[in-house]
């Protein structure tokens, strides 16, 4: 429903009927954000890994955590109030702005692998030395574009009903642009990583050890760039109901779309687990943290094994 006789200063609310949905979203997204924080701490406590993977895996890990915080705090705020049987009240302008910020930061988090892909393309294919802050500059430009798209909801949008706010200033055209741009940039990241992987496998003539590490890291980055696309498929399917009026099962539209909220965890963990250097250290922590004394011997064995099987200088990955 579209409203014409209201303004941005009109008071709107988040209805109690939104409680179950936001609770489910927060349980999924909040859990992933917390685990993402642990992954950030894991890197920070291991300077050798931090130095090695700072512009690649750590950048994506920290970036997804930071960019997931606005949505995390919004969900937490709504869950607390709605379970207290209080409907949050704010102006349409405030609710629209918050919605725009959380939507844009979510998209920015999903396209983080693109900056890494561009960075590695220059290093691997073009054989150029690039500073680690290059990924920050590239992603800042991409983020600015998303924020501009989000703000355009104000001049181009209309007052419509919404689940999060009873009335919201919203533009279907800008939302379609945001979703399409997110998907397009993710596909571009996959394309670049495939190009890098093909180059490394066929044309890279460096020594065997460097070549092996470069192939491993390239495969890891390719896997990482595919995760945001895979977890967003249910949301893309759900958009057919929103834009074209196709009827979808209620369970799909209220539950399966939430796979998008798995991205803050699956995107960084996929690349971390695909590299033996990181995977063995993570396994060592899990074993030493959650198992009893008897299995700590296994943890020590895993640690020793990882030190003998993995290249002794993980910093060699920095040249990959």
From Swiss-Prot:
InterPro entries: DUF1182 (IPR010601). The chain crosses the membrane at residues 24-44, 65-85, 105-125, 132-152, 179-199, 226-246, 253-275. Pfam families: DUF1182. It is found in: Membrane. Keywords: Membrane, Transmembrane, Transmembrane helix. Signal peptide: none annotated. It is a multi-pass membrane protein. GO terms for cellular component: membrane. SUPFAM superfamilies: Family A G protein-coupled receptor-like. It comes from the Eukaryota. PANTHER family: PROTEIN CBG09954. This is Uncharacterized protein ZK757.1.
